[in-house]
Amino acid sequence: MARIVGVELPNNKKVWVALTYIYGIGRSRSFEILKNTGVDPDKRVGELTDEEISKITKYIQDHFKVEGELRSEVERNIRRLIEIGCYRGIRHKLGLPVRGQKTRSNARTRKGPRPSRIKTKKKSS
């Protein structure tokens, strides 16, 4: 397994697919990286040479924020929105959809599970 920017990539996958395992790299970015480093996208990760792995790693580190750095930036941005008290920040704080979706009947994932009601036994008279 090749290790690129701290992520173990499976040997049996094609390189362009394996790069999408890295947080912050999707399909189009994966192809961009491989085009600029001169690596064949259809090559398997197990077939990569050490030189190709180091070229890919260097390109990613020089051009993109990925993994922990990207996660912390996103988290900081959300914290800032909450701190300044804007509409989006309030929605984040309340755990509701942020981008204008309706919430009357949907948004179950974002709202979370409903609090369950305590069942009481009926007295038999």
Swiss-Prot record:
**Matching InterPro entries:** Rbsml_uS13_C, Ribosomal_uS13, Ribosomal_uS13-like_H2TH, Ribosomal_uS13_bac-type, Ribosomal_uS13_CS
Look up the domain of life of the source. Answer: Bacteria
Which UniProt keywords are given for this protein, alphabetically ordered? Ribonucleoprotein, Ribosomal protein, RNA-binding, rRNA-binding, tRNA-binding
Region (Disordered): which ranges? 97-125
GO annotation terms (biological process):
translation
Q: What are the protein's GO molecular function terms?
A: rRNA binding; structural constituent of ribosome; tRNA binding
Family the entry assigns: Belongs to the universal ribosomal protein uS13 family.
- PANTHER family per the record? 30S RIBOSOMAL PROTEIN S13/40S RIBOSOMAL PROTEIN S18, SMALL RIBOSOMAL SUBUNIT PROTEIN US13M
| Quaternary structure and partners | Part of the 30S ribosomal subunit. Forms a loose heterodimer with protein S19. Forms two bridges to the 50S subunit in the 70S ribosome.
Job description of the protein: Located at the top of the head of the 30S subunit, it contacts several helices of the 16S rRNA. In the 70S ribosome it contacts the 23S rRNA (bridge B1a) and protein L5 of the 50S subunit (bridge B1b), connecting the 2 subunits; these bridges are implicated in subunit movement. Contacts the tRNAs in the A and P-sites.
HAMAP family linked to this entry: Ribosomal_uS13
Q: Provide the protein name.
A: Small ribosomal subunit protein uS13
The species is: Thermotoga neapolitana (strain ATCC 49049 / DSM 4359 / NBRC 107923 / NS-E)
